[in-house]
Amino acid sequence: MFKEIFTRFIRHLPSRLVHRDPLPGAQQTVNTAVPPSLSAHCLKMAVMPEEELWKTFDTHPEGLNQAEVESAREQHGENKLPAQQPSPWWVHLWVCYRNPFNILLTILGAISYATEDLFAAGVIALMVAISTLLNFIQEARSTKAADALKAMVSNTATVLRVINDKGENGWLEIPIDQLVPGDIIKLAAGDMIPADLRILQARDLFVAQASLTGESLPVEKTATTRQPEHSNPLECDTLCFMGTTVVSGTAQAMVIATGDNTWFGQLAGRVSEQESEPNAFQQGISRVSMLLIRFMLVMAPVVLLINGYTKGDWWEAALFALSVAVGLTPEMLPMIVTSTLARGAVKLSKQKVIVKHLDAIQNFGAMDILCTDKTGTLTQDKIVLENHTDISGKTSERVLHSAWLNSHYQTGLKNLLDTAVLEGTDEESARSLASRWQKIDEIPFDFERRRMSVVVAENTEHHQLVCKGALQEILNVCSQVRHNGEIVPLDDIMLRKIKRVTDTLNRQGLRVVAVATKYLPAREGDYQRADESDLILEGYIAFLDPPKETTAPALKALKASGITVKILTGDSELVAAKVCHEVGLDAGEVVIGSDIETLSDDELANLAQRTTLFARLTPMHKERIVTLLKREGHVVGFMGDGINDAPALRAADIGISVDGAVDIAREAADIILLEKSLMVLEEGVIEGRRTFANMLKYIKMTASSNFGNVFSVLVASAFLPFLPMLPLHLLIQNLLYDVSQVAIPFDNVDDEQIQKPQRWNPADLGRFMIFFGPISSIFDILTFCLMWWVFHANTPETQTLFQSGWFVVGLLSQTLIVHMIRTRRVPFIQSCASWPLMIMTVIVMIVGIALPFSPLASYLQLQALPLSYFPWLVAILAGYMTLTQLVKGFYSRRYGWQ
């Protein structure tokens, strides 16, 4: 029961700061019912005539004006899900309190109060208050910072609004939370559906609804109303729902519901209540913390039995065991985790890296393989139209003009190639083409066909279909070519000629796109994919995208950091290999998409580990490669910004996208780069490792210190005629130690700790406890001997002196361990802690030494230590530090150091 509560708490700890977009968990709601009234409303909207729609939402084809928008927003609220609404401060305070560690301390405090140990109860209450308030303050600051970070990468929608008092309208790009029912929006490939919509116009619109239905294949949406065959609104052709994604095509649609009134909004509360599988970070924190709690639950009864049996005072033994249990409870862990992750996220933002999901920071630091596309990552992402040629490689204005018509009139997702074509055509030619040719229709791009077409007309008698796309996909639908001004069959001779010319262009680092046309009699009705047949290959347009100057040094830096870079691209293998050569990346043997389809998972997994460059890949190829690399034990990052990258982004341990990416890519990513650069990424990786290293410090310190303390207590309890330390001493010591840990998130990290990927290793933690825990016990036992034989504190009458002596040694050694374990180097000489941590530990040590001499000493049942004690104290601490350093050197040589 307790483990279940604890695991749930750890799983949701980071998500309270930066809410994960609910989409990834939504597929769990396939069989979750929504209110019947919502289903009925959606079914009604699906078949409602368009004229009635305008009246229902008090809108019109020209769009809403500002007054109408404000009225609608006042009525329906902002377009935000319930999970995105901020909770009141008292709810946050309660959430910060109700972690398992505080609950455990509260129970122990209640027992102390019931047994009339009011001082112990007060100290425990103070510990709980400090832990809760520090966590609350840190989360409040982190939430504010996280909101600012999220605002930097917010999604937008293109909406039709009245823009002035004259009633003129225009298309505006606004944040999706500003949409209101009645708005008219545009949709294109790659867009996330921002609200529940009724389709008004659509061209080959295919939407992925897997997030709501679990169906992997996209479904077509149309503006044609018909009575639904089923009572499930998700199957209505005229409706699109928030959280789904446009795969291909274009559309105009009316917003019919926003925020928690949407289908997804009704499910959001239930989605958030359902448990998702914990990731590696959450599992690691959970395992470590449960290890410490189990250790406490086992050792406290053992301490009780030994003290009760040897001393005969079971009441005092129970209080002492209770205090030991308090000391073994890692109550500061939630604050340390929260503070470290949040501070890391803020620091990453200064490196132009926005963390959407805080627990992704650990994977960022653990990443050992980075899969990335070529375009814009290795290259400048400033594509220039270099050539426009016929099939023989001769410059052709006809090919350029055909490409311009295609790029100018297509309304889908305009990529950099379209922009380069439009910019590469002179203004006079562009004006002439626009005046002569009118658009009739278009067949949008999709990643299955890898081409797109527009249909244009110069007169009323004929239409011309202009198609451009990947060379092989265009050749698949061509039967003829234009050669020396004549149309000839596409035979083997021509295919060899085409391959020779395009290979030459590819070897020059040029990306080749084929252009084909087809003349058709003018007709009514829409054009379909089937019309892309028997085309005439006109020629090619070739683009240059030179490598960035920063790519080569960034690749070297990533390699030095232990990260292997693999290129996963849809481009030609010749172009990709040329770019890899220019940036100093050894491509080796190139694997292409068609080869992958013939391989089993085991074969591809082995091949993927030794291959650097994959070319001509589909989105599913990329996803499969990433999944298999993960299966082999790698922590895999994937960097992409296109629709075709979304499956791989979701499959990766850490999805990385850029601010200018399509909506679906940004939604799927864990981390957003404000600058598409491997150098920025490398800096982010290093910061991620620093964050993880500081979090690991607290866990290692706590684990080893607790192990040593319990061992010392057991030895003392077995042989001393009195308690080695009173319960309140243990509580005060633990309280002071907690204070010294507050500054750990601000600590420095040695360079060698960030030179390689860092991962959770529970086995290493257990080994670390066994190695370093008993060291403090050795010097604790020496202290027992010192107080017993040198200072003759060996009777119940002199036990206060004994307890005061061990109180100071225990507190100082426990505080010094912070400096000893934070680095593999020699502390204070080769590696210094940050000033905040140094100041906090010095203050705690001074307070610890001063307490036996202070006016509080009698109340705390401590006594002033003789001056002769302090040379021994220095010797014990020096010996402790020396032995720890020697063991640390052996340990790091044998097992390494995280």
Which role does the model predict for each range below?
Residues 115, 123-154, 161, 277-372, ...:
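Hydrophobic alpha-helical transmembrane segments
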Residues 303, 334, 341-343, 587-638, ...:
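Membrane-embedded transport module
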Residues 103-123, 163-166, 291-329, 342, ...:
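Helix-interface capping motifs at the ends of transmembrane segments in multi-pass membrane proteins
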Residues 206, 213, 223-224, 380-401, ...:
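Basic, amphipathic juxtamembrane/active-site segments
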Residues 239-247, 363-537, 543, 556-557, ...:
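Cytosolic catalytic regions of ATP/NTP-dependent phosphoryl-transfer enzymes
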Residues 95-114, 128, 132, 154-155, ...:
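Alpha-helical transmembrane segments of multi-pass membrane proteins
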Residues 1-180, 185-193, 198-206, 210-217, ...:
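Non-lumenal N-terminal regulatory segments of integral membrane proteins
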